[in-house]
């Protein structure tokens, strides 16, 4: 949020090297480089060092930095601690490459003068090729990450670290887990190359700062505790959590908090004065954190926050800018841990609604939902809409979050709180003149609402402690009130003049609506999420907006998030990256496969947040609620075989099934029961829960031995074994595999970099990466690949282990 793209310097024409044949313009040399992208071993280390040293000399002249060291690495390339230093893209061509006259004495002594001249010529050519690759349009972020990981030369690493400033923020953000994992677990030169970019971006974006702090903590957790405490990752995390990286404009605003005369204060100034006077109480935030800490890791985090907060002047400084958001996240996690201690789903649901009702007392505040893609402030959580999701041992839950979109999170004021009892007046504005209230009176009534939350102190830990209190009856009255307000808003919008509609038109419209309206699920106390997930998203947004005191505001938005405690989402994040990369590859190669990667926020090694898939329910819920086969459910939802709606849903099913079958094969995704496969309103299937991938399986049983899950019910929806859509499915599988193996390196490097220093179960065993590469079948012809696809499809359909695992899940967890 609030990311600012670093504008690269305009590209200058690059002088072509003269080492290629006449008239070739060096094209053959460039083709040689592009054929071996990532194979850094073919480049002489001394040549790479010399080439990059020349570029870095130019950087030194541009930035006025410290001279380049003898190893080729800059001692101070980009001053990450400087706020106003200009960051420029290093696309300018370097100076003419110097001959290595001073360094060649030993080489000449060991060989003939002719051999030395030939070696110098070859080195110059290799130097030119490498630099031309780095400056070409082919050099994208994926290639930069590959060279940063594979290179052993500090000069190359430092050059690429500076090239990170040239790429779009969103492109680099995709590889943030890889960058931070390299920073933590690889040598110092890699860390020195990465840090300036991380520090610069943290100054620009509070959301980027939060992401870095969370990932650094999660990926450092696999280290030994004594090593972890003094590691570079821990030090960088402490720097981010302190106030050192606060944007300059926020630091300059602090003197404005000095006391002002009481006379003639405007309402806004009076509010500001109040927040300053309460700053002393709010600054003690860190000392109260330990009341809600539930494990030693959280306590350690709190100690770090406390130490950084004590140095702040209580009179003039607000708390660390990330402190309110961290408290908001910790309170959501604490709710999940408390829910897990309750025995029944109904008790968990009641407790969840009560806890969220108390949480609303501290909103609006300077907090946001990190899974969203735009700047906003959280203003309200409609607590009666929250549901507990299916889980045997834990208590993941789904909440909906009302936010107000803003241009810049850091500079926009926190919205004023609107009490719940003002819903009627805000939603029935057009009726107010009839009640004798003028427009001026109405405007005046809203302007007198004090903005008590327009500061960083809006989130107080003292009130979070109150969440320990159970209020089982809170949700009942709130639900009734919201229902009443919804009715009032509907009646208030009724037209004043009668409208006459023919009875035949009414019957026709009702019949059309019934034909296209999806069926609703019945409320099940053991599965309360089914009804909530089945409701169409747009209908849910309309309903919640009508019941919200903020719903009348034009920048009101509704978000949703799944909160998970006790689960390590680092594997989920890895799977998300692979799915996102495959999705990009198939789009680039124009293969109409469909998959739905959903965002993952890793909070710690055992907690996180997940972006829900809207308008989708699990196949288990479909079968349990409808008591129909998958094909019959399709017919019920989308119409008969020949309708356009059914044919469109069938095509969507085939394209998504083929896409996820390839994903499951390449990543070896396990635990594929019907509770982990969703079906959306358009007919797509979406696989969720990637907790068992690559080298791991549930309880290490190795139950699922087939390449992917393809049941007879899936084939029936496709039209049977002899249907055209089933042949289309196999053709898509072949096209998708051919396209994926063309870009194998982009997929493999995502996984390979994350294996560094990791103790995740998916990396157990020494052959994880080798087996992943083998599943791309680089040596096979297309005819052999076609035969392979036929064999995998046939084997998956006939797999006895798939049937056994589905039966096992039904007996142990009741999953149909």
Swiss-Prot record:
Annotated spans, Activation loop: 687-711
Domain PI3K/PI4K catalytic: 535-801
GO molecular function: 1-phosphatidylinositol 4-kinase activity; 14-3-3 protein binding; ATP binding
Domain (PIK helical) ranges: 52-242
Region annotation Disordered: where it falls in the sequence: 1-30, 99-120, 248-318
Cofactor dependency: Mg(2+); Mn(2+)
PANTHER family recorded: PHOSPHATIDYLINOSITOL 4-KINASE BETA, PHOSPHATIDYLINOSITOL KINASE
Known role: Phosphorylates phosphatidylinositol (PI) in the first committed step in the production of the second messenger inositol-1,4,5,-trisphosphate (PIP). May regulate Golgi disintegration/reorganization during mitosis, possibly via its phosphorylation. Involved in Golgi-to-plasma membrane trafficking.
Protein name (database record): Phosphatidylinositol 4-kinase beta
Organism field: Callithrix jacchus
